Amino acid sequence: MLARLARLFSRPSTAPVWVEAAELRRWLAGEGAPVIVDVRGPDEFAGSLGHIAGARNIPLGELPAHANALAAEGRPLVMVCLTDKRSAQAAAVLVADGTRHVAVLRGGMKAWRATIG
């Protein structure tokens, strides 16, 4: 799995990479862990589904103001929302702006909770 992600991220991308919840869990446990960016609003982020440990809450509408700082960290970024619609939009914005190494959690927090708990 990590080899697959490394391979995908080793070449320029015009589209974000999609990762499954189980893949993301393994990625977070290994070296080179990504930055998790949760693009839901603060109420959703703190709500009943919670959020992935260590995730940064940057609502979708605020993402452009943070794009340069996120890219400057030099770590892969994984976008997360409730399902994956807003996170896919967020990833598309970042990729269009030239940010590399952007992924989307397929199924969002619903998939994360169903898979990870």
Protein language model regions, located:
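Conserved beta/loop motifs at nucleotide-recognition and modification sites
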Residues: 37
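Short, surface-exposed ligand- or partner-binding patches at beta-edge/loop junctions that are enriched
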Residues: 80
